[in-house]
Amino acid sequence: MKLMILDGNSIVNRAFYGVRPLSAPDGTPTNAVYGFLAILQRMLDEQKPEAVCVSFDLKAPTFRHKACNFYKAQRKPMPEELAVQMPLLKETLDAMGIRRYEIESFEADDILGTAAAVCERSGWDCVVVTGDKDSLQLVSETTSVCNVKTVRGQTETILYTPESFRAEYGFAPAQMVDLKALMGDSSDNIPGVPGIGEKTALDLVRRYGTVDKIYSSLAALDIKDGVRKKLTEGEASARQSYWLATIVRDVPLLPRGEHLEQQLYSGALRRNEAARVQTLH
């Protein structure tokens, strides 16, 4: 069985900025909805999953925001032209019978990670569809990540498997967290180690593996004294950044006593012919 889960906020943002302005007869913008559904249909055609669902962020602060007030603090509010399309998109997904997950205190990425973990322990394949690289840490033998972008209305995709990821980055997918812990992530306002950029961070992860291994033998590493000094002074920031960048994989998606595996499996057996997808309930 194959589950496909879409990173709702990420995909709709890519669609909004990648598709020319469109509107309904009453003037309501629709380009983001159109672009999202086009990506959804393409992924359904290419991946042919037995089940599909979508994760969304909520407006309320998550546990990361509450712990670190600088987390994503630089983000601008969602453009009004996009905000007015969100209810329409969710109504459309509901009409198609596609299950939506929005969990208080957690991000959409954490829902993606939890779905991937469910698939792994259930022996299913999982395809995560996203416009961000945060989810690349989830790539495994059972989980692939399809990175999507829309350019001038045309959708481009890159499918990451353990082999293709390692060929591009030179280390294991799980070490994406270590990379972000060192170099930071300006889009999420994750600081990383001050003075350590992408090139140096990539070299460190490729040579020494993980943040823990780097700091456990920092004095003996074959690195420049300046880099060692930055790492020494920035250890607390690296540890905090590692925590912020790590996707949670045990989000409580269902009330206590209910089993997500059963929900996904039973939903996958119910075919919505009008939408041409198999749904989650």
For each feature predicted by the language model, list its residue ranges.
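Non-catalytic, usually N-terminal nucleic-acid engagement modules in DNA/RNA processing proteins
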Residues: M1-C53, D57, R64
